[in-house]
């Protein structure tokens, strides 16, 4: 036999080792003894050490890489990793199936049913059959790059089997820690003095986020694939079960417990069987996932917010424990909501120490009759959020009295009130309440809002308590001097230490001024008296002398970075800005819908509440909340202050033409929610007058003569008798006319510059997000699609564009860089 040269031998060893991995981890059919596997692995490792050029990224030797020097970089998921809605009862599952059958017209649709592993969701990206990147789910849109750690998992193939895989393949699945392996690891950890893992799920998540892949490699992690993300169009699927079969063929482990079942009966029977064997499984599961098998049906059902309508997680009953309520305190949120929180004697529930639970509202406390000193049953709903489910009244201590909502806010002393019919009590102090200001600022700077990196909760609390920041606009006036003063005082554990540290930055009369400030707030500089409890806050509130900061004696980089981050946030998108304002009921999805529909902050802040119902999926309650927010002079002043301090919306655009159908008189009458005015009656009334103010002039007799039924006619005339309603109608009509004037006229709609064009975006844009770019392009008539084909009009390519750019070149698709995109958008804005 002719000896193989090193390159041939290395290739042969890689092939045999990868084949062995596939049979061992996927098929559970070992082909070679462990000793033979180890021998081949050592031989390949030696070859690659001798000939470094022979090492390849997919080599079995690369499963343990080099230590990562810094924290993980962010990865933006091409296809979002959606969360699932939960079902906690049989009726919820029946309702889930009913919605699908009603929409699709099938009596017993097929579902893929599988255990919901209690691990960490990840996305694996393969290009030309080679594993190139792995990321955590993160927030569903952006995750962390954990490629090096995922290479250490023997159950994740580095190179795909077969040759039927697509050019680009994203595989979605769960990294988990088998329970026997978890227990064995903890046994060894105790013997060696290592930190033991709290539970398998935390063990999996923590292991995957180690900065050193060698540590990850020591942890007993496994992987199951359950779906796909981005896939190039050279492979087509019709059913989810086909996807799972292909994943198995390509080398991915897929749960052997996955079954194809039919109708609600099939789902519930599967759930019962899995519930019975749950404790015998070698891994933790917290429920069952049901997915509609037919992919065309999935497309028809669509999505709601961040979850698909064609899938649901049927959760098992959570684990429960008993503990004692030590106190009931009130927490004030950013909207003033006063939420009672029970402080508990610490207890372990499903592997997590629970010390407090939210009691939601006063009605919930009254329903459960929770009292201080009670023994309560605590469970983790969905194995995530702790909650009190019952009180053991037989164990109630003598003298325990029923709890009632305090009349005053524990933070600012303002009255706590509840609107008629509402479940939530609120502090009436609004932004005069420091707790609400703190929460409002925390929300404003959060990553998915204005994204001010480096401004943490503790810093926000100090800025508000020290009266440096009174509202979000004050952030844009923060100076280096203010931040360094904050750090100097908070780092000083005693007044004496503050004076000692201050000598590096101030001398003479100014140092004496600082001493006088300390005396003024009650500090005895002799060191004999007691130090006031809040002396640091009182000192920060005082009028300080000027400091000459010695940058060698105090860290300044953090403050400079924070000021730079605040400055960067001045350029933002409309959806981020609206979300950052913290309006009640306005989450990211609603903010995005508002931005897409109206396009301009100047428009949105002037609209009366009924016009917000023109936006898809916004109902009366949400519309009223937005309108109420915008009607408050203090909120309008806050927006003015932000604009005055340089905050600019970078993606403003005209209102979308789809609003036109919502701006008819009949639609306006519907949006006003006048009693007895049904959609059919609104259409009839719209024929009687061209505008709302003119319709208001019609008396009861005129309406009756026009054929309007008595109940509707009387309701309308009574509604218009209110001066407030007349004012609302006039304002509504005026804003409607303004919006209509800014829309493209019907005869010009087809002349939108990108009408009928198909556009793909790839890579990272520096000036605006891809979502903002997509919104701008859609407003100009473009259709945004996810993959490049011969029908693509042009591709917008930012930094790190990936395979879409290669495909665009191959298909001779026109390619725009960011400069060309911005020039085009600016040209249209100018027109």
Curated annotation (Swiss-Prot):
<feature type="binding site">
    <location>
        <begin position="83"/>
        <end position="84"/>
    </location>
    <ligand>
        <name>NAD(+)</name>
    </ligand>
</feature>
<dbReference type="InterPro" id="IPR041663">
    <property type="entry name" value="DisA/LigA_HHH"/>
</dbReference>
<feature type="binding site">
    <location>
        <position position="315"/>
    </location>
    <ligand>
        <name>NAD(+)</name>
    </ligand>
</feature>
<dbReference type="InterPro" id="IPR001679">
    <property type="entry name" value="DNA_ligase"/>
</dbReference>
<feature type="domain" description="BRCT">
    <location>
        <begin position="749"/>
        <end position="831"/>
    </location>
</feature>
<dbReference type="Pfam" id="PF03119">
    <property type="entry name" value="DNA_ligase_ZBD"/>
</dbReference>
<keyword id="KW-0436">Ligase</keyword>
<dbReference type="GO" id="GO:0046872">
    <property type="term" value="F:metal ion binding"/>
</dbReference>
<keyword id="KW-0234">DNA repair</keyword>
<comment type="similarity">
    <text>Belongs to the NAD-dependent DNA ligase family. LigA subfamily.</text>
</comment>
<dbReference type="GO" id="GO:0005829">
    <property type="term" value="C:cytosol"/>
</dbReference>
<dbReference type="Pfam" id="PF01653">
    <property type="entry name" value="DNA_ligase_aden"/>
</dbReference>
<keyword id="KW-0464">Manganese</keyword>
<keyword id="KW-0460">Magnesium</keyword>
<keyword id="KW-0862">Zinc</keyword>
<feature type="binding site">
    <location>
        <position position="412"/>
    </location>
    <ligand>
        <name>Zn(2+)</name>
    </ligand>
</feature>
<dbReference type="InterPro" id="IPR001357">
    <property type="entry name" value="BRCT_dom"/>
</dbReference>
<dbReference type="InterPro" id="IPR012340">
    <property type="entry name" value="NA-bd_OB-fold"/>
</dbReference>
<feature type="binding site">
    <location>
        <position position="291"/>
    </location>
    <ligand>
        <name>NAD(+)</name>
    </ligand>
</feature>
<dbReference type="Pfam" id="PF03120">
    <property type="entry name" value="DNA_ligase_OB"/>
</dbReference>
<dbReference type="GO" id="GO:0003911">
    <property type="term" value="F:DNA ligase (NAD+) activity"/>
</dbReference>
<dbReference type="Pfam" id="PF12826">
    <property type="entry name" value="HHH_2"/>
</dbReference>
<feature type="active site" description="N6-AMP-lysine intermediate">
    <location>
        <position position="116"/>
    </location>
</feature>
<dbReference type="InterPro" id="IPR036420">
    <property type="entry name" value="BRCT_dom_sf"/>
</dbReference>
<dbReference type="Pfam" id="PF00533">
    <property type="entry name" value="BRCT"/>
</dbReference>
<dbReference type="InterPro" id="IPR013840">
    <property type="entry name" value="DNAligase_N"/>
</dbReference>
<comment type="function">
    <text>DNA ligase that catalyzes the formation of phosphodiester linkages between 5'-phosphoryl and 3'-hydroxyl groups in double-stranded DNA using NAD as a coenzyme and as the energy source for the reaction. It is essential for DNA replication and repair of damaged DNA.</text>
</comment>
<keyword id="KW-0520">NAD</keyword>
<feature type="binding site">
    <location>
        <position position="137"/>
    </location>
    <ligand>
        <name>NAD(+)</name>
    </ligand>
</feature>
<dbReference type="InterPro" id="IPR018239">
    <property type="entry name" value="DNA_ligase_AS"/>
</dbReference>
<dbReference type="InterPro" id="IPR013839">
    <property type="entry name" value="DNAligase_adenylation"/>
</dbReference>
<keyword id="KW-0227">DNA damage</keyword>
<feature type="binding site">
    <location>
        <position position="114"/>
    </location>
    <ligand>
        <name>NAD(+)</name>
    </ligand>
</feature>
<feature type="binding site">
    <location>
        <begin position="34"/>
        <end position="38"/>
    </location>
    <ligand>
        <name>NAD(+)</name>
    </ligand>
</feature>
<dbReference type="InterPro" id="IPR004149">
    <property type="entry name" value="Znf_DNAligase_C4"/>
</dbReference>
<dbReference type="InterPro" id="IPR010994">
    <property type="entry name" value="RuvA_2-like"/>
</dbReference>
<protein>
    <recommendedName>
        <fullName>DNA ligase</fullName>
        <ecNumber>6.5.1.2</ecNumber>
    </recommendedName>
</protein>
<feature type="binding site">
    <location>
        <position position="409"/>
    </location>
    <ligand>
        <name>Zn(2+)</name>
    </ligand>
</feature>
<dbReference type="InterPro" id="IPR004150">
    <property type="entry name" value="NAD_DNA_ligase_OB"/>
</dbReference>
<dbReference type="GO" id="GO:0006260">
    <property type="term" value="P:DNA replication"/>
</dbReference>
<feature type="binding site">
    <location>
        <position position="433"/>
    </location>
    <ligand>
        <name>Zn(2+)</name>
    </ligand>
</feature>
<dbReference type="GO" id="GO:0006281">
    <property type="term" value="P:DNA repair"/>
</dbReference>
């Amino acid at each position: 036999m002719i000896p193989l040269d090193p390159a041939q031998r290395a290739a042969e060893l890689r092939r045999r080792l990868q084949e062995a991995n596939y049979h061992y981890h996927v098929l559970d059919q070992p082909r070679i003894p462990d000793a033979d596997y180890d021998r081949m692995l050592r031989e390949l490792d030696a070859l690659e050490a001798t000939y470094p050029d022979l090492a390849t990224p997919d080599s079995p030797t690369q499963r343990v890489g080099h230590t990562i020097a810094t924290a993980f970089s962010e990865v933006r998921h091409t296809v979002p990793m959606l969360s699932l809605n939960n079902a906690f009862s049989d009726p919820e599952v029946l309702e889930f199936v009913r919605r699908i059958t009603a929409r699709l017209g099938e009596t017993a649709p097929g579902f893929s049913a599988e255990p919901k592993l209690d691990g960490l969701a990840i996305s694996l990206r393969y290009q030309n059959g080679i594993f190139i990147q792995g990321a955590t789910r993160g927030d569903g849109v952006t995750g962390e790059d954990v490629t090096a750690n995922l290479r250490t998992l023997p159950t994740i193939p580095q190179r795909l089997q077969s040759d039927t895989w697509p050019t680009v393949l994203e595989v979605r699945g769960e990294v988990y820690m088998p329970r026997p392996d978890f227990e064995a690891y903890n046994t060894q950890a105790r013997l060696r003095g290592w930190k033991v893992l709290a539970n398998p799920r935390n063990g999996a998540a923590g292991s995957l986020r180690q900065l050193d892949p060698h540590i990850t490699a020591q942890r007993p992690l496994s992987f199951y694939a359950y779906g796909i993300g981005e896939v190039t169009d050279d492979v087509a699927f019709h059913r989810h079960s086909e996807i799972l079969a292909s994943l198995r063929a390509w080398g991915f482990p897929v749960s052997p417990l996955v079954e194809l079942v039919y109708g609600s009966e099939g789902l519930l029977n599967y759930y019962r069987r899995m519930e019975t064997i749950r404790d015998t499984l070698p891994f933790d599961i917290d429920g069952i996932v049901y997915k509609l098998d037919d992919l065309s049906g999935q497309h028809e059902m669509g999505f709601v917010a961040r979850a698909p309508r064609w899938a649901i997680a049927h959760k098992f009953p959570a684990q429960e424990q008993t503990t004692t309520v030590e106190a009931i305190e009130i927490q004030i949120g950013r909207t003033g909501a006063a939420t009672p929180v029970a402080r508990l004697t610490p207890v372990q529930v499903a592997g997590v120490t629970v010390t407090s639970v939210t009691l939601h509202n006063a009605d919930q406390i009254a329903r459960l009759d929770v009292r201080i000193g009670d023994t309560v049953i605590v469970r983790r709903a969905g194995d995530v959020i702790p909650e009190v489910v019952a009180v053991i009244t037989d164990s109630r201590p003598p003298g325990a009295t029923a709890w009632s909502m305090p009349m005053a806010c524990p933070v600012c002393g303002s009255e706590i009130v509840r609107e008629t019919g509402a479940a939530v009590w609120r502090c009436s102090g609004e932004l005069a309440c420091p707790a609400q200001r703190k929460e409002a600022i925390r929300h404003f700077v959060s990553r998915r809002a204005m994204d001010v990196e480096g401004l943490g909760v503790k810093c926000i609390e100090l800025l508000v308590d020290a009266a440096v920041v009174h509202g979000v606009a004050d952030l844009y006036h923060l100076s280096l001097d203010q931040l360094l003063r904050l750090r100097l005082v908070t780092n000083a554990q005693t007044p004496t230490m503050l004076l000692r540290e201050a000598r590096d930055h101030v001398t003479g009369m100014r140092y004496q001024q600082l001493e006088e400030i300390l005396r003024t707030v009650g500090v005895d500089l002799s060191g004999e008296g007691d130090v006031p409890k809040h002396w640091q806050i009182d000192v920060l509130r005082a009028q300080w002398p000027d400091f000459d900061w010695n940058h060698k004696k105090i860290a300044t980089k953090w403050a400079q970075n924070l000021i730079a981050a605040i400055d960067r946030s001045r350029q933002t998108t409309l959806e981020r800005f609206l979300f950052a304002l913290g309006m009640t009921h306005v989450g990211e999805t609603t903010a995005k819908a508002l931005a897409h529909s109206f396009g301009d902050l100047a428009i949105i802040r002037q609209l009366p509440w009924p016009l917000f119902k023109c936006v898809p999926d916004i109902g009366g309650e949400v519309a009223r909340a937005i309108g109420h927010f915008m009607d408050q002079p203090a909120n309008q002043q806050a927006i003015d202050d932000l604009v005055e301090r340089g905050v600019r919306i970078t993606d403003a655009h005209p209102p979308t033409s789809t609003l036109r159908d919502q701006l008819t008189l009949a639609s306006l009458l519907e949006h006003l929610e006048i009693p007895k005015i049904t959609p059919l009656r609104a259409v009839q009334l719209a024929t009687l007058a061209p505008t709302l103010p003119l319709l208001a002039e019609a008396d009861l007799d005129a309406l009756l003569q026009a054929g309007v039924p008595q109940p509707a006619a009387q309701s309308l005339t009574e509604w218009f008798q209110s001066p407030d309603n007349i004012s609302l109608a006039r304002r509504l009509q005026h804003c409607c006319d303004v919006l209509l004037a800014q829309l493209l006229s019907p005869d010009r709609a087809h002349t939108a510059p990108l009408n009928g064009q198909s556009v793909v975006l790839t890579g990272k844009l520096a000036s605006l997000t891809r979502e903002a770019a997509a919104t701008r392009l859609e407003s100009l008539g473009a259709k945004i699609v996810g993959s490049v084909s011969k029908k693509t009009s042009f591709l917008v390519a930012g930094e790190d564009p990936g395979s879409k750019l290669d495909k665009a070149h191959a298909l001779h698709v026109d390619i725009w860089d960011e400069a060309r995109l911005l020039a085009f958008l600016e040209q249209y804005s100018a027109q």
